[in-house]
């Protein structure tokens, strides 16, 4: 049988001081949705989810954040620079307004985008991303760099994790800047991101809903892809959960 899996278009685009690698599927004329991966992951983590979005007529773009995969490995890393990269990527692709989906660190980046240029985000999905801590946590134990090659730059871990773990008294006020309809997806007690933490985010974003996929853990879209799709598809595509489809093989 002839496969109807969507064609994956691989590309790179130079923006400011970096080159960003990305994967694109679906109709170039479809409503765009940009997918942002977690720390240490990459664009390919969204392959199955992106294919299903493409089957619903969406233009799907998943990028490697700086320091990951085929994108530039740079001298400095921060959530702000990653946010700048995503906004520059939208400009380079000619995308004025988009849906945005982010997992973990990618969710933190997506939130920054939706705060800084609220008019550019139509719908926002944030998967298991914690808010800043209420107080400074205990220091993390040092972790030794693995001997085997990694698909990301080891040097980016410390500054990004430090930024995520730093208390930020103004975070609630900045979440009020988000005008996009927002869906938070949590992984339940099996995740290190507590339901209470996600509830604080849910209470701060003006137009927001929180859904928990019980026992999914931190990587909801990978560990529980069917449940993740059933939750996110109606929000992004207006697809009833009982009518979700996947590309045929």
PLM feature spans:
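Conserved hydrolase catalytic core segment
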Residues: 96-133
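Helical cap/lid subdomains and adjacent loops of hydrolase enzymes that gate the active-site channel
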Residues: 127-177
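Conserved serine/cysteine hydrolase catalytic core
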Residues: 163-204, 209-212, 221, 225
């Amino acid at each position: 049988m002839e496969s109807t899996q969507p064609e994956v278009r691989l590309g790179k685009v130079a923006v400011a001081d970096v080159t960003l690698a990305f994967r694109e599927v679906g109709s170039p004329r479809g409503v765009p949705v940009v997918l942002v991966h977690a720390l240490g992951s990459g664009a390919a983590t969204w392959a199955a989810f992106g294919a299903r979005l493409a089957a619903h007529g969406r233009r799907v773009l998943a990028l490697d954040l700086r320091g990951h995969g085929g994108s530039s490995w740079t001298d400095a890393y921060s959530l702000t620079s990653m946010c700048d990269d995503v906004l520059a990527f939208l400009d380079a692709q000619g995308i004025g307004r988009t849906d945005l989906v982010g997992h973990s660190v990618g969710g933190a980046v997506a939130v920054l985008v939706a705060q800084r240029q609220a008019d550019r985000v139509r719908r926002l999905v944030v998967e298991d991303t914690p808010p800043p801590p209420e107080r400074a946590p205990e220091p993390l134990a040092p972790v030794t760099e693995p001997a085997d090659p990694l698909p990301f730059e080891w040097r980016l871990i410390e500054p990004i994790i430090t930024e995520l773990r730093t208390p930020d008294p103004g975070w609630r006020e900045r979440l009020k800047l988000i005008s996009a309809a927002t869906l938070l997806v949590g992984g339940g007690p099996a995740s290190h991101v507590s339901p209470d933490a996600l509830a604080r985010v849910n209470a701060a974003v003006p137009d927001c809903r929180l859904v928990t996929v019980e026992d999914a853990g931190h990587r909801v879209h990978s560990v529980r892809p069917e449940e993740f799709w059933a939750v996110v598809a109606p929000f992004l595509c207006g697809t009833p959960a009982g009518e979700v489809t996947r590309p045929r093989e």
